[in-house]
Amino acid sequence: MRLEAASRALARPAHYLRTPTLIQQISWTKKTLGHRHRVVAVRVGPSDEAEKTVPSDADRAYMNRAIDLSLTPGGPMSTYPNPRVGCVIVSASDEIVGEGYHPRAGLPHAEPYALRGAGQLARGATAYVTLEPCDHYGRTAPCSQALIDAGIRRVVVGIGDPNPLVDGGGIARLRKAGIEVVVGCEEDRCFDVNKEFFERITKNG
């Protein structure tokens, strides 16, 4: 499945137009309904590496597909207490080879479903995930480790997960394994999908 060139004609998010001066892990806040949540990202200063942290038009198109998948279970409470998450695996030849979404609490997250569909084609591919991959053992194993074990080369994350059990840990694990990570692709839309989740986690945290 290949995206047409027309789907790449999307504008780059304004907050990614800024050019930082060095590699750094930062936090920023986003206000909603009187509450704030923290999102962790990594920015790279002016160099050949800088473009790697900026979502491309193709990245945005694939992320929008992942967002659409995340809405499959239904309304905001359909996966309660978990967030709604979608994942798309794209091969080096720009083909979608796996897709998945989290259907409900207690079942696998989006990433394992997408990786299962991709099989061996996941090796060297890019994973588009609407929310930072989890990094802890709960009802399921860490999705960050599943991506590593599958041989994923690059991960594009829609928005960080403010859950104290994750909160940057998934991104850190992926980077430690040598995987390129881009954070903040279609961030606003990814936030809106799980607005209730973000508010609840922030309030309880």
Residues covered by each model-derived region:
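Short, basic/aromatic recognition patches
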Residues: 55-79
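Zn2+-dependent cytidine deaminase-like catalytic core
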Residues: 89-191
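Phosphate/diphosphate-binding glycine-rich loops and adjacent basic-rich segments that engage nucleotide
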Residues: 196-205
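N-terminal mitochondrial targeting presequences
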Residues: 36-49
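N-terminal chloroplast transit peptides
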Residues: 1-30
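RNA-binding accessory domains that recognize and position tRNA/RNA substrates
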Residues: 49-50, 88
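Short beta-strand scaffold segments in enzyme catalytic cores
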Residues: 81-91
